[in-house]
Amino acid sequence: MKSKTLPAWARLVCTAAAALVFLLVYEWAVYGVSLGKIYLPASAWSDEVYYAKQLSAVVTHGVPQGYFGFNESHAEIGRFAAWGPAVFYLYAIPGLIFRGQNAFLYCNLFWVLAGWLCFVWGTRLDWKRQLLFGVGIAALNAPVRYVFSAMQEPLHYALVLAVLGLAAGIRRGCRHAGAVWAALFALCAAATLVRPYNAVLWLFPLVLAWPRRKAVGGTVVGAAASAAGTLVLMKKFYAPYLFANIDLGAVEELLHGHFWAAARSVYYKLLGAWQQLGQEIADGTRVGSCYLLLFALLLVTLACVIWNAAHKQPVFWKVCALVVTLVV
């Protein structure tokens, strides 16, 4: 929201309040569920149970105390399920305030609102554009639906929004640029530590730093360090179940100097994923429908890039969005 009669802090408060009302109304209108009727411990999604219990353990004990896995198995104390420890320590920041059975949900609301505010601050969206933005994510459904769960996805949505907002602020020449640059680096590092493929978000500080050699070098070092850090964390503190989230076969081949074997491993992984994608779409599954929606959004964005380029209009953010999406 934007008003010339209100100070900046008051506008941010109004924006946060409006965004919160939007999220709550959407959940009630679409699913007929109010916030007070959500009880995460009774969720049918096993991931929600794992995540909620681990957040509680991190806030209370500092590390998980072992969780019930498949076939009545247990994890070692200090081991984390799915993606390693970084995500749960990030959730523990608001989790120190938001306690109780639905703490994960309240943390999701906190992160999404924080990401929304960063995005609005950097892009300077007025209330009309924010309303259009809200309609867009409501149409996608998942970005709002997952907020009211114990799933990690809302944190990733928030990190992407915050990175975009800070990058936009830097590009338009915001005040206190040094502090904003530091925050952008911290967010990109945090996103990468949460999930390795989020390293692609370093594209934004990289293109903003170009062609200054020191700035580019610092960005590359930050990206490499955070990517290596998340692999180490997952190797040391990750308790896999049924499957490993990250296949390090190609990396291990590279470390042993087997470049052709590494390339072949990546090729067959991509080929298998592409074949599975085609099967999901052909069978009309929910996953296949989501991929069709993604492809439709990519085509729309590509068409906008071509249109803007042909009419000599800015294409910077659309090109970055395309590259990031394709890499992920």
Label the model's feature ranges.
Residues A18-L20, L132-I137, A183-C188, L297, ...:
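Transmembrane alpha-helix segments characteristic
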Residues Y31-G36, D47-I77, A86:
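Extracytosolic helix-loop segments that constitute the early lumenal/periplasmic catalytic or substrate-binding loops
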Residues G78-A114, G288-L293:
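Loop-to-helix entry region of an early transmembrane alpha helix in multi-pass inner-membrane enzymes
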Residues V112-V120, Q275-F316, T325-V327:
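Hydrophobic, aromatic-rich transmembrane alpha-helices
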Residues L117-W121, L155-C174, V180-C188:
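Specific aromatic-rich, kink-prone transmembrane helix
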Residues R145-H156:
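Short acidic/glycine- and proline-prone juxtamembrane loop motifs at membrane-interface regions
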Residues L166-G173, A179, V200-A227:
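Perimembrane helix-loop-helix junctions
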Residues K214-V300:
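Membrane-lumen/periplasm interface segments of specific transmembrane helices
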